[in-house]
Amino acid sequence: MFGGVKWSPQSWMSDTRSSIEKKCIGQVYMVGAHNAGTHGIQMFSPFGLDAPEKLRSLPPYVTFLLRFLTVGVSSRWGRCQNLSIRQLLDHGVRYLDLRMNISPDQENKIYTTHFHISVPLQEVLKDVKDFLTTPASANEFVILDFLHFYGFNESHTMKRFVEELQALEEFYIPTTVSLTTPLCNLWQSTRRIFLVVRPYVEYPYARLRSVALKSIWVNQMELNDLLDRLEELMTRDLEDVSIGGVPSKMYVTQAIGTPRNNDFAVAACCGACPGSHPDLYSAAKHKNPHLLKWFYDLNVNGVMRGERVTIRRGNNTHGNILLLDFVQEGTCTVKGVDKPMNAVALCVHLNTNQTARS
């Protein structure tokens, strides 16, 4: 309960309606799941088309032996979430980062991927539909961001992709509706999904990614390097006088680590090196609490690394979608609140209390 408002992860947007209804989607704090749909990756899952070609071209018996000897190191670093799409949504996640892959074994079968093939797109869409047709969650908004397509071609497989998307057509918010529209206006209809696609597709509900949101990959693994890069982005936008008013784009803060080759090598040794991370889960479990504390300090106190900054109204840099690996991991302490908060609770707190952007 924040500010006298009771909320649940399945319905936090509806529960905090009085606090967020005058905001547009780009002004609402929420948690995003990096590489959502990778929960299905297992030790011997087939390589996706986003995996290095040298690995994909190896004979099956060689890849089997390689995975066996390294205890499936590539799958342990390829899996960014261990919750299904429905579980992520029930947990309170409202932004799903998705990568698509054409299956090499079944013609036109579309799967999620991150170095390894995971679950069918149809399963992803079904989970989203089941969530939105649950009465408690019927007023929640969801952002589907399809940013990578491996093995697709415009004339055939992209057409199949659009056909599969039609399973949720009744929920898509038309592209004619501006992203600056207040949520109170959007709640007047039953459409709840912002559909974002990186390549242009002929579909009236698909927003071109470059127009709909800003999401900068910082390409760092070490925590301090990651925070430094995120703060560089904030500093740059603080100096941009053109930023103001109601943001016309959503903003994704990529609070995620990007593993290097040496991370894979060390992990293959099964954690033989002290302080090393055997998988992405371990790395996220270590980083997420620090990232949540940084996000809190910036948005509540206007502080970056101990120094106060002034955030112009309308600047949603690091003030909208917090993208995480293993979103359920990590908590931070919030002033005036007895119990530590996870990422979703922190975002609800920011939405219902005074912030440095208010």
Curated annotation (Swiss-Prot):
Its EC number is 4.6.1.14. PROSITE patterns: PIPLC_X_DOMAIN. GO terms for biological process: glycerophospholipid metabolic process; lipid metabolic process. Gene3D superfamilies: Phosphatidylinositol (PI) phosphodiesterase. It catalyses: a 6-(alpha-D-glucosaminyl)-1-(1,2-diacyl-sn-glycero-3-phospho)-1D-myo-inositol = 6-(alpha-D-glucosaminyl)-1D-myo-inositol 1,2-cyclic phosphate + a 1,2-diacyl-sn-glycerol. It is found in: Membrane. SUPFAM superfamilies: PLC-like phosphodiesterases (SSF51695). Its main location: membrane. Pfam families: PI-PLC-X. Monomer. This is Variant-surface-glycoprotein phospholipase C. It comes from Trypanosoma brucei brucei.
